[in-house]
């Protein structure tokens, strides 16, 4: 079995090789590799990309998809026993109709039950094993039973963890529903966890009651969710906070406390069971993910073993890897001795969207069986598919050119779109290289360092999925990424006017566009109109003048904003004012940066979160309205978000942003899911085809309410605004608009502000007024559009530059150095850094 599993995993790794990216024949099989010497700094002419994909593996996996015809709603658990695959699934039961004893209204709902199924691998037909019977709820009680975990035994039988709970409302004979509630008579009944040993036909072999013995303080943790069985028959059950160990008869041997961090029960091999948990070492003041083996002899945890910091959902190891784990939708193997990890299963390479996965199993013959549950929003229904991965000769698969996408974590929405692109494209497929997989608990930037090192050596990916860590300006200045206007200008459908113009202008660098986000939100600051509304400029002098209108002890922002907070936020919102990667120049010795330092220095050095005496009126709205605070930092991503955050302020508000030396409002865009294309890729047109796919469907996403930020496409943005300004009416069962007693149509509020009960420190309760907002007004729309029109910068964070600044300003914040001397040192060090990188 171990050898077969190893062969399977190694062959799955080879899928990546089969789909290798655009590398020229005869060169390295690493996607996007050139012949530049390692460690050298390439010029644009040295950066090269491939012409065609190269087949580098003998074997690959072919995915076969089949619809599951069984009448169950969803799959709970899956495991393989021999060549059979078993499913624990929820089945739609009978429809129940009940009548409310108080109102007389009737309502219906469906019951569900758990069933055990055996799957026919050839047809996809799932047959329910009717010999399997779940524990029944006693008459007169309510409750439920759930299969939490399944594990196959070597002899083809199954172990199943079943949790059972009951309750009832034991109302008296004279119970009157008009004056009393049945919830006053709630009684909790029997609650237990059982381990069922089940034969291949579903019949019960044995049942072990593994109800733990707990103290009164431990009763809170009463839901065992997983188990392991070792070769001696000992059972290990866990509920995150505790691990309970039983012998083969179900007798509890001992219990272990997983500490305040909790622990996930996992089995490293047939005889080694323990927990994965976070451990902090006081001596070294370091911490990380650790495996704590359970020692049966000492009835305690053994010596901690280091695990990858991004490891979750563990699987037993074999003769190659000590254990396997999930990370970002893929499976990795881990070697404890060398403390190294390797990706062994990449679902995207098999055209499988792991977002939809219910579970998978590995068969002895090397096949992999996975189950996908996909919701079709158009049809309003979900479907279940079985996917069988079968090893085939790589040469039998259609050859496609690979587009290598570099990222620092792949979000779930984009994963689905990549799978769809790979399935439908006859010529290309996207190969994802997630550099976050190289991060360690000691170095969370190791992946970013590796990506930049590869770029410097000439290995440039075709496509970048951007995030805050990626230095886009540096890439643009070095000629690594392309001007996207060349693709937009030659596009048959799109033009520059297809996009939200203020955002594009803010993203431009010397008239060129190097990144394309799919959505954005606004970051700014506002104050009360009666306080900041009359200023024609917004400089530090203006801010200081506005502070004189407030209470003597008023703060600029909330009490918890510190010097370092303000410095980082101000620089990230406008770093382009101080660093120009195109010309490799910096200007930190400018009056603007000196003024920024002085502004940041006006805030407290730190904030004592633990000992601060919080008051009821410490919320931002109350502080602004009462004159205790000048400005509120705000980010909003939709028109409704604006309504939620910006209503309820005395005299209205005005967006002024951060103060600046030129007096303009310092607002910024924060972009989401941004793309950049390699300047030297041979797959530029195909890469752009994928990017434009993410843009063209945005208007439909607005209709479906499946986009959560302002869209970058102008037509989608306009439709989002139109929907926000359009009221939503209430309809009756005939589809007709409902009206109130005054003949006015009834609307659904887009937002409800206030309401509820306010409790003062002395216990006094005050009913708060509730305000419902039904649509965005034209005046509010004009405010938002004006704010977007007057936003000229994009939030950008360069960790290396920020580290230099943080290091140098420490003495200034401590009063040991002047702002001018600090600015001069920052100028010198950042200038040296920029020259080294250019």
What are these regions, as identified by a protein language model?
Residues 733-830:
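C-terminal capping/gating helix-and-loop segments adjacent to ligand/active sites or protein-protein/ligand interfaces
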Residues 485-498, 576-598, 657-667, 815:
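Short, solvent-exposed loop/beta-turn-alpha elements that line the ligand-binding surface or hinge
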Residues 583-617, 643-644, 651-658:
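Glycine-centered hinge/linker elements that transmit conformational signals in sensory
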Residues 646-731, 745-746, 790:
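Extracytoplasmic/periplasmic substrate-recognition and gating elements
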Residues 475-479, 485, 500-544, 560-585, ...:
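Periplasmic solute-binding protein
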Residues 224-225, 452-455, 461-462, 491-530, ...:
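A structural signal for short loop-to-beta-strand junctions that line the ligand-binding cleft
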Residues 23-24, 29-81, 85-110, 115-117, ...:
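Conserved N-terminal structural module of periplasmic/extracytoplasmic solute-binding proteins
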Residues 429-499, 508, 621-625, 630-631, ...:
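Extracytoplasmic "Venus flytrap"/periplasmic binding protein-like
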